[in-house]
Design a protein with these regions (language model features):
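C-terminal catalytic core of Y-nucleophile DNA break-rejoin enzymes
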Residues: 84-103, 112-132
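C-terminal secondary-structure termini that scaffold catalytic or DNA-interacting sites
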Residues: 1-27, 202-205
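Basic, Lys/Arg- and aromatic-enriched nucleic-acid-binding interface segment
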Residues: 28-58
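Conserved tyrosine-mediated DNA breakage-rejoining catalytic core shared by Y-recombinases
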Residues: 2, 8-10, 67-99
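DNA/chromatin major-groove-contacting recognition/catalytic segments
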Residues: 24, 93-97, 164, 188-205
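Short, basic (Lys/Arg/His-rich) helix/loop patches that form interaction surfaces
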Residues: 40-43, 128-169, 173
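Short, polar N-cap/turn motifs at the start of nucleic acid-interacting alpha helices
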Residues: 73-75, 164-187
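Catalytic-site neighborhood detector that most strongly recognizes the C-terminal catalytic loop/helix
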Residues: 86, 175-200
Length: 205
């Protein structure tokens, strides 16, 4: 009975982590991301510092991020991959900032073998490091995971483009969501925010 209870407890923890990762991860503001990034740089955990930059700027899931080698990203203008979850082919443009950051971190990390995987931690360990780091810098959000980076990047693009519906639809396509309702929940767009759109009709014709 003890073995069964322990096994059940393990399953519960695994399911809880999966729920946080896939459904309800909190997004982080750019200020919170900067604080978290500085925390890992101070600890000289450059793998985690780069993960924050990479995940935020590419909107990729950890299952895809964890497959990249240095050779596949350094001095590249595009990333080519088949998404592990969806099986869909993706072409992701590497912006000038990310391109420069990859070179910078490669040097800081003492030029690893080009065939080395960049992000070597397991998903579980990575999530624990993110959660511990967040607490260490005073971020009080409880549902932080690798998925928070993807969600934060998507939310940032949406807000930077004045919550444009055109940009929203493009972000939804990038995220490969089944429908726009999923994307609205994902970006944390509330019913109140949707209702506020109608305030634009407060004009006299």
């Amino acid at each position: 009975m003890l073995v069964l209870r322990l096994f059940g407890s393990t399953l519960a923890r695994n399911n809880f982590m999966k729920t946080i990762t896939e459904k309800t991860s909190d997004y982080l503001t750019t200020d919170e991301l900067k604080r978290l990034n500085r925390h890992f740089q101070k600890d000289q955990n450059y793998q985690m510092a780069l993960l924050i930059e990479f995940g935020f700027r590419t909107l990729l899931r950890f299952s895809d991020l964890s497959r990249f080698t240095w050779e596949s990203v350094l001095n590249k203008d595009e990333l080519l991959l088949i998404e592990k979850k969806t099986g869909k082919r993706r072409v992701i443009k590497i912006g000038a900032v990310l391109k420069s950051l990859l070179i910078e971190y490669y040097e800081i990390m003492h030029q690893p073998d080009l065939h080395d995987i960049i992000f070597k931690y397991t998903l579980r360990h990575t999530n624990r490091l993110l959660q511990y780091g967040a607490r260490s810098v005073g971020i009080r959000k409880k549902r932080i995971s690798t998925h928070s980076l993807r969600k934060s990047g998507a939310r940032f693009l949406y807000e930077e483009n004045n919550r444009s519906e055109d940009v929203f639809l493009k972000i939804s396509m990038i995220l490969n969501h089944s429908n726009t309702q999923v994307s609205r929940r994902y970006l944390g767009i509330t019913k109140e925010e949707i209702s506020d759109v109608y305030a634009g009709f407060d004009i006299v014709l």
